[in-house]
């Protein structure tokens, strides 16, 4: 079994079960301010899980690119990944627990698909509490498929209940599926909750059955949904009998190239192996971010900062391997080779990716020089031979200077470092980052409010108004919406004049005053394009798409949600117009209630 074969088998299986294959979305979620990147397969489907009608139907399957940033500093072990793919299938009210479980069981055990013996399967279900009953329904389905009671674990909400995000909203029990790896039990009490590695979690089926209200009451949903997820890389490692995802075809071409560049052999020395794993993970994530349709570049903010950090961390660990020259662009071909059959954007943008990596690599070499100069300046003013932890952390956080390099310089110049002090500051930083990472993983559902919906509609008016004032070359490059404001990035090479800004505001406010209706249609993508519907440049779309028309003014391919009439918006006001990156301008705007 290979990475490509597993991906194809999953898609083909669910298509045979009448699921419609939808395209995976951009790594950067559209109009979701709570997240930097899509971190789970369900995130792009949140509006549909909440009740929006999906243009492709109510039984869906796809592969979603995901990127998690909360554990970047832990990457380097055998399991943590920054970029990964999530296989997922969904029912938006079409079926529920029984059919979901039976599909999962068939895919796992059928000789045509994964061919895992059913006597190696273990499952967990929700044990119930004073608010939600025990999930005997799912357990009985598993029993009917031949899973004995002693291999069905009833676990608490911490293990087998999803949501809600925040204090209220959709939620429900889940069933997790495990495979016995054949390893010896770590103790007499070893079970599926143990982290010893005997039981591998291969799949999770979430049953969105309840709505929790503001008073903490759980009410049965009329439209129950299923959301399942299987990590592609972890599953292929299990199927190939590997102890680590890095030993699979998802990483080995990159690792082989790093071996060639560094002269090190993977598997001979753990310190070197860790460096190789970090570089392999980070270069893959960086390539996918740069290839993404969202147009992210290395910077000191948001997604750009994550990209910059991945690149610079790769360079730091390459230095530990003895690589002293530019090398990142040399790894791009290996990443593209792994994914070319499924992600053609890596092939199409390969030269661009190499150029951006080389540019950022050169910048970091200059940063290292500047960091060393700052180190010398700081140590001249110290009254002792110990560098305080806050100073070492400042070099790391403000100047992007890795701690290990500070340590090397300290040794060279005859200084010690208050490492415990540095670790204290670093842990605070990590805690903050992890909170952000948790928010990224669980976010989305919390922010589909009336205020953000109004601002989303306003971005459509803004997009069209910009084209009318500046020209048809204006194309959306990204947006970010909070309950307070919208941020809209668009293609335009010059700073807007005050007169242009005023004209755009006037056009938008006129459409609001005219009380235009907002209508949704579902049509084939080709038809939408023939009608002149605007779409995100570089984004991949399914054959059937949702198109929102603002009565005679704007027509856009969009997943929603939107208000029903522009008269709901209030007064539109541009607060700031500035450069986002080369050739890209950014507008921040608000709606003022009248």
Curated annotation (Swiss-Prot):
Can you state which reaction this protein catalyses? Answer: tRNA(Ala) + L-alanine + ATP = L-alanyl-tRNA(Ala) + AMP + diphosphate
> What's its top-level EC category?
ligase
Q: How is the cofactor bound?
A: Binds 1 zinc ion per subunit.
Please give the Pfam families that the UniProt record associates with this protein: tRNA-synt_2c, tRNA_SAD
One of this protein's GO BP terms? Answer: alanyl-tRNA aminoacylation
Q: Where in the cell is it found?
A: Cytoplasm
GO MF annotations for this entry? alanine-tRNA ligase activity; aminoacyl-tRNA deacylase activity; ATP binding; tRNA binding; zinc ion binding
Q: What is its EC number?
A: 6.1.1.7
The entry's cellular-component GO terms read: cytosol
The prosthetic group or cofactor this protein requires is: Zn(2+)
Which keywords belong to this entry?
Aminoacyl-tRNA synthetase, ATP-binding, Cytoplasm, Ligase, Metal-binding, Nucleotide-binding, Protein biosynthesis, RNA-binding, tRNA-binding, Zinc
What residues does Zn(2+) bind to? 456, 460, 558, 562
- What note about domains is in the entry? Consists of two domains; the N-terminal catalytic domain (in this organism this is shorter than usual) and the editing domain; the C-terminal C-Ala domain found in most orthologs is missing. The editing domain removes incorrectly charged amino acids.
Q: What does this protein do?
A: Catalyzes the attachment of alanine to tRNA(Ala) in a two-step reaction: alanine is first activated by ATP to form Ala-AMP and then transferred to the acceptor end of tRNA(Ala). Also edits incorrectly charged Ser-tRNA(Ala) and Gly-tRNA(Ala) via its editing domain.
Q: Which family does it belong to?
A: Belongs to the class-II aminoacyl-tRNA synthetase family.
Q: Give the protein name, as stated in the record.
A: Alanine--tRNA ligase
Q: Which organism is it from?
A: Borreliella afzelii (strain PKo) (Borrelia afzelii)
């Amino acid at each position: 079994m290979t990475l490509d074969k597993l991906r194809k088998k999953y898609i083909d299986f669910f298509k045979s079960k009448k699921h419609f294959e939808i395209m995976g979305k951009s790594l950067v979620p559209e109009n979701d301010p709570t997240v930097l990147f899509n971190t789970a397969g369900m995130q792009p489907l949140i509006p549909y899980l909440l009740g929006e009608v999906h243009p492709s139907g109510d039984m869906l399957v796809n592969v979603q690119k995901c990127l998690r940033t909360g554990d970047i500093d832990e990457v380097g072990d055998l399991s943590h990944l920054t970029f990964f793919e999530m296989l997922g299938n969904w029912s938006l009210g079409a079926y529920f627990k029984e059919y979901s479980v039976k599909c999962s069981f068939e895919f796992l055990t059928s000789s045509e698909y994964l061919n895992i013996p059913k006597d190696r399967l273990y499952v967990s279900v929700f044990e119930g509490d004073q608010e939600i009953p025990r999930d005997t329904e799912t357990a009985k389905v598993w029993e009917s498929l031949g899973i004995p009671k002693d291999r069905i674990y009833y676990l608490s909400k911490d293990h087998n209940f999803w949501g809600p995000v925040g204090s209220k909203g959709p939620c429900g029990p889940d069933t997790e599926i495990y495979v016995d790896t054949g390893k010896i039990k770590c103790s007499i009490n070893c079970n599926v909750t143990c982290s010893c590695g005997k039981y591998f979690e291969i799949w999770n089926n979430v049953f969105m059955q309840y709505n929790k209200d503001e008073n903490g009451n759980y009410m049965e949903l009329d439209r129950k949904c299923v959301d399942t997820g299987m990590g592609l890389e972890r599953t292929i490692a299990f199927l190939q009998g590997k102890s680590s995802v890095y030993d699979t075809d998802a990483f080995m071409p990159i690792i082989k190239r790093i071996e060639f560049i560094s002269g090190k052999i993977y598997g001979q020395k753990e310190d070197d192996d860790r460096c190789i794993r970090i570089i392999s993970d980070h270069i893959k994530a960086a390539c996918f971010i740069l290839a993404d349709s969202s147009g992210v570049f290395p910077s000191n903010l948001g997604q750009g900062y994550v990209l910059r950090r991945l690149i610079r961390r790769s360079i730091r660990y390459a230095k530990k391997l003895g690589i002293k020259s530019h090398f990142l662009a040399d790894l791009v071909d290996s990443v593209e080779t792994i994914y070319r059959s499924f992600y053609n954007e890596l092939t199409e943008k390969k030269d661009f990716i190499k150029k951006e990596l080389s540019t950022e690599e050169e910048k970091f070499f200059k940063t290292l020089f500047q960091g060393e100069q700052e180190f010398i300046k700081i140590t001249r003013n110290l009254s002792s031979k110990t560098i305080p932890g806050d100073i070492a952390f400042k070099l790391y956080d403000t100047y992007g200077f890795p701690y290990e390099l500070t340590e090397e310089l300290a040794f060279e110049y005859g200084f010690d470092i208050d490492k415990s002090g540095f670790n204290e500051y670093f842990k605070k930083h990590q805690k903050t980052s992890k909170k952000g990472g948790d928010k990224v993983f669980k976010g989305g559902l919390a922010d589909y409010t009336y205020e953000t919906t109004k601002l989303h509609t306003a971005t459509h008016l803004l997009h069209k108004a910009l084209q009318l004032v500046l020209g048809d070359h204006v194309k959306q490059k990204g947006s970010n919406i909070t309950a307070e404001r919208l941020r809209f990035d668009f293609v335009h090479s010059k700073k807007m004049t005050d007169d242009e800004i005023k004209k755009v505001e006037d056009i938008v406010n006129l459409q609001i005053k005219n009380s235009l209706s907002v209508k949704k249609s579902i049509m084939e993508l080709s038809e939408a394009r023939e009608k002149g519907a605007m779409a995100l440049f570089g984004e991949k779309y399914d054959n059937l798409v949702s198109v929102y028309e603002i009565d005679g003014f704007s027509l856009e391919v969009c997943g929603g949600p939107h208000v029903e009439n522009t008269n709901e918006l209030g007064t539109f006001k541009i607060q700031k117009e500035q450069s986002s990156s080369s050739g890209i301008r950014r507008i921040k705007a608000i709606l003022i209630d009248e």
